[in-house]
């Protein structure tokens, strides 16, 4: 009887311990699952809140810049545009001035008034930094142009000299021929001697043609040599100046 009683108590105690342990495991599992579910739920709510924050930041328009900065930018843009426009206008005006006094010098450089105006143009615009290089080249061009004009004038004068010599030689030759004809005619009136008439004609021919040639050939040779000297002198100067461009 006592043995059965002890066995019953031990079985009941064992069942009680078993049930208690199972109940603790169940609670632990439940709390673990609950904590796991809570952490998942918290993470999901946190990510949802962050997404909503990003969407609100993207949807909200950016704050406009202060009107002072915008006005300053507009003012600076206007000033730069005005400066560019003024520089372009100045450049166009200076280019027109350059073209004008280039034409003035090339076309009308013979007059003293035009030369004075050209010198004034050079004084006014030679100090411009933008056109210093151009002005240097232009001055070199003026030197070449002056040398070409001097060469043309010297050659023209030399040609006039040669033409004058030829004209004088031709005139004197014709005059000598006419004088010879008149002398032959006068001799034929006074005498019928053909030898005398032929002698007068030969003397007149010798004076008119070879005599004039001997007189004017040195002058023509001098003119030709002078032409060669002028051409060589100015050609060397022009070549040196052109090589400095």
From Swiss-Prot:
Cytoplasmic side: 26-164, 218-245
Organism: Plasmodium falciparum (isolate 3D7)
Record region (Disordered): 52-71
Keywords: ATP-binding, Disulfide bond, Host cell membrane, Host membrane, Membrane, Nucleotide-binding, Signal, Transmembrane, Transmembrane helix
Designated name of the protein: CX3CL1-binding protein 2
Ranges per topology, Extracellular: 186-196
Its job: During the asexual blood stage and probably at the ring/trophozoite stages, plays a role in Maurer's cleft formation and/or morphology. Also, involved in the loading of the virulence factor EMP1 into the Maurer's cleft membrane. By binding to host chemokine CX3CL1, mediates the cytoadherence of host erythrocytes infected with parasite mature forms (late trophozoite and schizont) to endothelial cells, which sequesters them away from the circulation and thus prevents their elimination by the host spleen.
Domain notes: The first cytoplasmic domain binds ATP and nucleic acids such as RNA and DNA in vitro. The P.falciparum Export Element (PEXEL) motif, also known as the vacuolar transport signal (VTS), is a pentameric sequence (RxLxE/Q/D) required for the translocation of proteins across the parasitophorous vacuole membrane. In the endoplasmic reticulum, the motif is cleaved after the leucine residue and the N-terminus is N-acetylated.
Complexes and interactors: Monomer. May form (via the first cytoplasmic domain) homodimers or homotrimers; disulfide-linked. Interacts with MAHRP1. May interact (via first cytoplasmic domain) with SBP1; the interaction is likely to occur at the ring stage in the Maurer's clefts and is weaken by ATP. Interacts (via extracellular domain) with human chemokine CX3CL1; the interaction mediates the adhesion of infected erythrocytes with endothelial cells.
GO biological process, alphabetically ordered: cell-cell adhesion; regulation of organelle assembly; regulation of protein targeting to membrane
Location of the protein in the cell: Host cell membrane
CC per GO annotation: host cell plasma membrane; Maurer's cleft; membrane
Signal sequence, renumbered to the chain: 1-25
Topology class, membrane: Multi-pass membrane protein
């Amino acid at each position: 009887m006592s043995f059965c009683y002890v066995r019953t108590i031990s079985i009941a105690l064992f069942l009680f311990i078993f049930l208690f342990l199972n109940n603790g495991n169940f609670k632990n599992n439940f709390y673990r699952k609950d904590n796991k579910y809570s952490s998942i739920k918290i993470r999901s709510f946190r990510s949802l809140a962050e997404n909503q924050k990003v969407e609100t930041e993207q949807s909200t328009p950016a704050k406009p810049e202060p009107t002072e900065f915008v006005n300053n930018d507009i003012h600076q843009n206007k000033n730069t545009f005005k400066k560019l426009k003024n520089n372009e206008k100045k450049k166009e005006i200076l280019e027109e001035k350059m073209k004008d006094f280039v034409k003035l010098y090339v076309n009308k450089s013979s007059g003293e008034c035009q030369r004075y105006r050209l010198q004034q143009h050079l004084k006014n615009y030679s100090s411009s930094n933008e056109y210093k290089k151009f002005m240097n080249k232009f001055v070199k061009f003026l030197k070449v142009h002056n040398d070409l004009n001097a060469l043309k004038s010297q050659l023209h004068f030399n040609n006039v000299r040669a033409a004058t010599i030829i004209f004088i030689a031709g005139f004197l030759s014709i005059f000598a021929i006419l004088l010879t004809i008149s002398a032959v005619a006068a001799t034929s009136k006074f005498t019928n001697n053909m030898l005398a008439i032929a002698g007068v004609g030969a003397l007149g021919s010798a004076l008119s043609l070879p005599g004039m040639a001997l007189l004017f050939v040195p002058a023509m040779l001098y003119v030709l040599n002078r032409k060669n000297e002028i051409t060589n002198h100015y050609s060397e100067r022009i070549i040196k100046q052109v090589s400095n461009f």
